[in-house]
C-alpha cells in the first residue's frame, strides 16, 4: 500500500499528518467504544452500578430540561462527573408518535497528546475535522440506541426517532457530522442542534435540520476548524461580545458556563422577536422540550474506549491506507483558489473538539 495524496489544502494536510504520524508512533491508540447507562430515572434506585473499575458518577441535575439554557447547564455539570469516560445526558420526551430525544453532550475533556480511556480527546477532534468516524460519534449513537432499547422502541425505528443535540465545543461538532448524513447511514435522526463554541463551520448539515450555533467573539475554538466565518448551510449564528474578565480570558470565553448564560439571553431575545430567523429557529428547538406535565425519562450514559496495545508486527500498511473522508469539508472557492476535494485521507484505525 502507499500513502494517499496529501490534501492540497494546508489545514487538511496538517490534520492528515497528525492522524497518520500519531497513529504510526502509537500516540493515538483508541480502540473499541463502550457505553453503559449509569443513571436511569425509571430505576429504583436511580443510580446504577458503574462499569467495573470505574468511579461512580457525580450527578445532581437529573430532571428533564425546561429550556435550552437547561440543556447547556446540564453540560456544565457533566464536565464534573468525575468518571473514567465521558458522560452524556439523554432525555426521552413523550410517547408514541410524539416521542423525541434530547441530548446534552460535553466537548473535549482530555487535552493530552495521546489516547486515554476517555474518548473525548484530541484524536476525536482530528478525525472529525477529516470527516471520519470518531469514538464520540460512535458512542453517542450507541448510547441513544441503548436508551431507545431500554424504552422498548423497536430497533427498526431507531434511525427515525427525532433527536435534538445540545453540544459544547467538540459535542457540537459531533452532532453536526451526524446531522450531515442520511439518518439511515448515521444510525440516528438528528433534526435539531444547539451548538456552543463548536468548530463546526466546515460541516454542512442536511437542509431539514434546524441548527443554531452560538459563538463568543473572543472564543478562538470555533475558528479552529480552518474555515472562514461563514455559514455553509441554513444555520442561524448567534454572537456575543464579552466583557474581558480580570483573569483567564480565553477560558472564560470558551467556558460552558459562560455559554449557558449566553443561551439564556438568546432565549429572552427570541421571545421578544419570535418572527425573525432566530426567533423561529429557537421556537423550533424549544418545541422539542417537554410540555408541562408531559412524560419524560432521563438516563445518563458513560462512554469510554479501550486502548490498543503496541504489537511487534509493523502497522505501517494500516496507517498508509486510511479511508476517504466523508462528509467532506465545505470549500469556499473565493478563499481557496485552486482547492480541490480531499482525495483520500485517514482510515481505519481505532474505533474512534
Where are these regions (language model features)?
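Alpha/beta hydrolase fold serine-hydrolase catalytic domain that processes acyl esters and thioesters
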Residues: 1-161, 183-353
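Gly/Ala-rich beta-loop-alpha elbow adjacent to hydrolase catalytic centers
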Residues: 166-179
Amino acid at each position: 500500500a502507499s500513502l494517499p495524496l496529501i490534501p492540497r489544502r494546508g489545514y487538511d494536510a496538517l490534520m492528515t499528518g497528525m492522524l497518520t504520524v500519531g497513529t504510526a508512533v502509537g500516540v493515538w491508540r483508541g480502540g473499541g467504544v463502550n457505553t453503559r447507562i449509569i443513571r436511569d430515572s425509571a430505576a429504583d434506585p436511580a443510580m446504577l452500578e458503574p462499569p467495573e473499575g470505574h468511579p461512580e458518577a457525580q450527578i445532581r441535575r437529573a430532571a428533564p430540561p425546561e429550556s435550552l439554557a437547561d440543556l447547556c447547564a446540564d453540560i456544565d455539570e457533566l464536565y464534573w462527573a468525575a468518571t473514567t469516560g465521558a458522560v452524556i445526558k439523554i432525555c426521552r420526551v413523550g410517547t408514541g408518535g410524539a416521542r423525541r430525544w434530547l441530548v446534552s453532550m460535553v466537548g473535549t475533556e482530555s487535552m493530552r497528546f495521546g489516547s486515554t480511556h476517555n474518548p473525548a480527546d484530541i484524536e476525536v477532534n482530528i478525525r472529525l475535522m477529516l470527516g471520519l468516524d470518531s469514538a464520540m460519534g460512535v458512542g453517542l449513537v450507541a448510547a441513544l440506541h441503548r436508551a431507545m432499547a431500554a424504552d422498548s422502541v423497536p430497533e427498526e425505528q431507531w434511525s427515525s426517532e427525532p433527536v435534538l443535540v445540545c453540544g459544547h465545543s467538540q459535542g457540537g461538532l459531533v452532532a453536526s457530522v451526524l446531522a450531515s448524513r442520511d439518518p439511515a447511514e448515521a444510525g440516528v435522526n438528528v433534526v435539531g442542534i444547539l451548538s456552543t463554541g463548536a468548530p463546526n463551520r466546515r460541516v454542512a448539515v442536511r437542509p431539514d435540520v434546524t441548527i443554531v450555533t452560538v459563538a463568543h467573539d473572543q472564543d478562538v475554538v470555533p475558528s479552529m476548524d480552518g474555515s472562514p466565518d461563514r455559514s455553509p448551510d441554513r444555520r442561524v449564528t448567534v454572537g456575543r461580545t464579552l466583557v474581558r474578565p480580570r483573569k483567564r480570558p480565553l477560558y472564560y470565553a470558551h467556558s460552558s458556563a459562560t455559554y449557558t448564560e449566553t443561551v439564556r439571553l438568546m432565549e429572552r431575545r427570541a421571545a421578544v422577536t419570535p418572527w425573525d430567523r432566530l426567533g423561529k429557529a429557537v421556537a423550533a428547538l424549544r418545541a422539542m422540550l417537554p410540555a408541562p406535565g408531559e412524560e419524560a425519562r432521563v438516563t445518563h450514559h458513560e462512554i469510554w474506549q479501550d486502548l490498543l496495545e503496541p504489537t511487534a508486527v509493523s502497522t505501517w500498511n494500516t496507517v498508509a491506507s486510511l479511508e476517504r473522508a466523508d462528509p467532506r469539508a465545505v470549500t469556499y472557492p473565493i478563499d481557496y483558489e485552486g482547492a480541490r476535494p480531499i482525495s483520500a485521507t485517514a482510515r481505519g484505525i481505532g474505533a474512534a473538539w
